[in-house]
């Protein structure tokens, strides 16, 4: 798939089968960093093989961490507590799950580092995290536009003068980065570390993932709801010995959606009713749209209408603040709804791999949908009968755009996905797995 300029999707009629999900991107990169910061050795299984995890692995090796060879999703990391390499230039691609947490960890350890990424990474805000780290005395310099990467880290005087405040309304990754790095500073300073959230915290389930994983590495965080988080002065990460990565719940959304519009059943394995990922809640969105959803330990299954034969999903008006990534799948499913659909509270889309509100608006209109959008909302009216249009779908160098619009193959229009290789960020084999579930239209 890598290197292909485009992929013409075969017109699809039915979907059924089972998919073993790749490892969660959010969990994979968190666990890699936690294992590096922990005492002892951690054997990680089920690790996602993707651009973002390869970026994190390369950075850890560059920082002096002993990282074993990755084989079949397994890798062993020897924890170092403090990175041996105190001067480095790190290229972190477009991986926010690597850039933000590494920025915090490096800033609180001391040293001299330069962090950069692809041009889009330099358009994704990091100012709120930098402002919070500067409250600890961290020396951080913007090497381009203020508030954005690239960054130079070093030259500060780290201290703890009281609670540190961080804005929560732009990205939950800023709070995640501070939480994960806080035990490093607590140990160094001998003081409790308190982080206070300013504004409305978005994407709360991702913070739950962070707290859950920190606990598995031996650090429990005291919290006052979503307003304040305290890490004790004696907090120390300790490797759990062995750590299995859950399947990616955001990726599960595309396959569960296939079951909802292609009859099904489609079952995903690797996530289930006991998942720590908030995006499993997308299954409830599908149920509200009329799909039959079933859960078990380590699996979720959907059955639904056959939109290629005239079936329709129920329209929705929903707040997607808690599951912004999976919400993109809902936006594409709106093509098959029985009325206009509205997605609210999705302002975080603006600062993802691309401006996803603008990108989704543009590409849905190409297919004939009526689309309106604002700062943090999107409304999609499905194409009128006879109103579908053949389209070349731009993916905007965004893996989720490519995967979402694979669902458009169930409509009557011819669909071409441009730059399908962008799925390598999280799921290089996506289109092969997708094709294995489909029955084509005659």
UniProtKB/Swiss-Prot annotation:
<feature type="binding site">
    <location>
        <position position="124"/>
    </location>
    <ligand>
        <name>phosphoenolpyruvate</name>
    </ligand>
</feature>
<feature type="binding site">
    <location>
        <position position="352"/>
    </location>
    <ligand>
        <name>3-phosphoshikimate</name>
    </ligand>
</feature>
<dbReference type="InterPro" id="IPR006264">
    <property type="entry name" value="EPSP_synthase"/>
</dbReference>
<feature type="binding site">
    <location>
        <position position="171"/>
    </location>
    <ligand>
        <name>3-phosphoshikimate</name>
    </ligand>
</feature>
<protein>
    <recommendedName>
        <fullName>3-phosphoshikimate 1-carboxyvinyltransferase</fullName>
        <ecNumber>2.5.1.19</ecNumber>
    </recommendedName>
</protein>
<dbReference type="GO" id="GO:0003866">
    <property type="term" value="F:3-phosphoshikimate 1-carboxyvinyltransferase activity"/>
</dbReference>
<comment type="function">
    <text>Catalyzes the transfer of the enolpyruvyl moiety of phosphoenolpyruvate (PEP) to the 5-hydroxyl of shikimate-3-phosphate (S3P) to produce enolpyruvyl shikimate-3-phosphate and inorganic phosphate.</text>
</comment>
<dbReference type="GO" id="GO:0009423">
    <property type="term" value="P:chorismate biosynthetic process"/>
</dbReference>
<feature type="binding site">
    <location>
        <position position="25"/>
    </location>
    <ligand>
        <name>phosphoenolpyruvate</name>
    </ligand>
</feature>
<keyword id="KW-0963">Cytoplasm</keyword>
<feature type="binding site">
    <location>
        <position position="325"/>
    </location>
    <ligand>
        <name>3-phosphoshikimate</name>
    </ligand>
</feature>
<feature type="binding site">
    <location>
        <position position="203"/>
    </location>
    <ligand>
        <name>3-phosphoshikimate</name>
    </ligand>
</feature>
<comment type="pathway">
    <text>Metabolic intermediate biosynthesis; chorismate biosynthesis; chorismate from D-erythrose 4-phosphate and phosphoenolpyruvate: step 6/7.</text>
</comment>
<feature type="binding site">
    <location>
        <position position="26"/>
    </location>
    <ligand>
        <name>3-phosphoshikimate</name>
    </ligand>
</feature>
<dbReference type="InterPro" id="IPR036968">
    <property type="entry name" value="Enolpyruvate_Tfrase_sf"/>
</dbReference>
<feature type="binding site">
    <location>
        <position position="30"/>
    </location>
    <ligand>
        <name>3-phosphoshikimate</name>
    </ligand>
</feature>
<feature type="binding site">
    <location>
        <position position="400"/>
    </location>
    <ligand>
        <name>phosphoenolpyruvate</name>
    </ligand>
</feature>
<feature type="active site" description="Proton acceptor">
    <location>
        <position position="325"/>
    </location>
</feature>
<dbReference type="GO" id="GO:0008652">
    <property type="term" value="P:amino acid biosynthetic process"/>
</dbReference>
<feature type="binding site">
    <location>
        <position position="173"/>
    </location>
    <ligand>
        <name>phosphoenolpyruvate</name>
    </ligand>
</feature>
<feature type="binding site">
    <location>
        <position position="173"/>
    </location>
    <ligand>
        <name>3-phosphoshikimate</name>
    </ligand>
</feature>
<dbReference type="InterPro" id="IPR023193">
    <property type="entry name" value="EPSP_synthase_CS"/>
</dbReference>
<feature type="binding site">
    <location>
        <position position="25"/>
    </location>
    <ligand>
        <name>3-phosphoshikimate</name>
    </ligand>
</feature>
<keyword id="KW-0808">Transferase</keyword>
<feature type="binding site">
    <location>
        <position position="425"/>
    </location>
    <ligand>
        <name>phosphoenolpyruvate</name>
    </ligand>
</feature>
<dbReference type="GO" id="GO:0009073">
    <property type="term" value="P:aromatic amino acid family biosynthetic process"/>
</dbReference>
<keyword id="KW-0057">Aromatic amino acid biosynthesis</keyword>
<dbReference type="InterPro" id="IPR013792">
    <property type="entry name" value="RNA3'P_cycl/enolpyr_Trfase_a/b"/>
</dbReference>
<feature type="binding site">
    <location>
        <position position="96"/>
    </location>
    <ligand>
        <name>phosphoenolpyruvate</name>
    </ligand>
</feature>
<dbReference type="Pfam" id="PF00275">
    <property type="entry name" value="EPSP_synthase"/>
</dbReference>
<feature type="binding site">
    <location>
        <position position="172"/>
    </location>
    <ligand>
        <name>3-phosphoshikimate</name>
    </ligand>
</feature>
<keyword id="KW-0028">Amino-acid biosynthesis</keyword>
<comment type="similarity">
    <text>Belongs to the EPSP synthase family.</text>
</comment>
<dbReference type="InterPro" id="IPR001986">
    <property type="entry name" value="Enolpyruvate_Tfrase_dom"/>
</dbReference>
<feature type="binding site">
    <location>
        <position position="356"/>
    </location>
    <ligand>
        <name>phosphoenolpyruvate</name>
    </ligand>
</feature>
<dbReference type="GO" id="GO:0005737">
    <property type="term" value="C:cytoplasm"/>
</dbReference>
<comment type="subunit">
    <text>Monomer.</text>
</comment>
């Amino acid at each position: 798939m890598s290197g292909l300029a485009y992929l013409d999707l075969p017109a699809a009629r039915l979907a059924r089968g089972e998919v073993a999900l790749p490892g969660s991107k959010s969990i994979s990169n968190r666990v890699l960093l936690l294992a590096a910061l922990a005492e002892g050795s951690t054997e990680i299984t089920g690790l996602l093989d993707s651009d973002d995890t390869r970026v994190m692995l390369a950075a850890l090796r560059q920082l002096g961490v002993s990282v074993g060879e990755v084989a079949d999703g397994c890798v062993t990391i020897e924890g170092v507590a403090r990175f041996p390499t105190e001067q480095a230039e790190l290229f972190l691609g477009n991986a926010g799950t690597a850039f933000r947490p590494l920025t915090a960890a490096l800033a609180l350890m001391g040293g001299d580092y330069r962090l950069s990424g692809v041009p889009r990474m330099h358009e994704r805000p990091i100012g709120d995290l930098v402002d919070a780290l500067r409250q600890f005395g961290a020396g951080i310099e913007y090497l381009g536009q203020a508030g954005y990467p690239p960054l130079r880290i070093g030259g500060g005087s780290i201290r703890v003068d009281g609670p540190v405040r961080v804005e929560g309304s732009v990205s939950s990754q800023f709070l995640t980065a501070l939480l994960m790095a806080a035990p490093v500073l607590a140990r160094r300073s001998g003081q409790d570390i308190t982080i206070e959230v300013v504004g409305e915290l978005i994407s709360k389930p991702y913070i739950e993932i962070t707290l859950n994983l920190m606990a598995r590495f031996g650090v429990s965080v005291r919290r006052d709801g979503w307003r304040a988080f305290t890490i004790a002065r004696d907090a120390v990460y300790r490797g759990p010995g062995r750590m299995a990565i859950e399947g990616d719940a955001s990726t599960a959304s595309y396959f569960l959606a296939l079951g909802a519009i292609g009859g099904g059943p489609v079952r995903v394995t690797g996530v289930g009713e006991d998942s720590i990922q908030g995006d499993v809640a997308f299954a409830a969105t599908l149920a509200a749209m009329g799909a039959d959803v079933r859960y078990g330990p380590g699996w979720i299954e959907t059955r639904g209408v056959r939109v290629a034969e005239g079936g329709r999903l129920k329209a929705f008006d929903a707040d997607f603040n808690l599951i912004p990534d999976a919400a993109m799948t809902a936006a594409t499913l709106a093509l098959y709804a029985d009325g206009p659909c509205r997605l609210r509270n999705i302002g975080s889309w603006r600062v993802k791999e691309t401006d996803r509100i603008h990108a989704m608006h543009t590409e849905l209109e190409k297919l004939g949908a009526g689309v309106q959008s604002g700062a943090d909302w999107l409304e999609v009216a499905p194409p009128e009968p006879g109103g579908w249009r053949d389209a070349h779908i731009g993916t905007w160098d965004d893996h989720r755009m490519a995967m979402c619009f694979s669902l458009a193959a169930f409509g009557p229009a011819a669909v071409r996905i441009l730059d399908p290789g962008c799925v390598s960020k999280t799921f290089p084999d996506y289109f092969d797995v997708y094709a294995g579930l489909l029955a084509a239209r005659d």
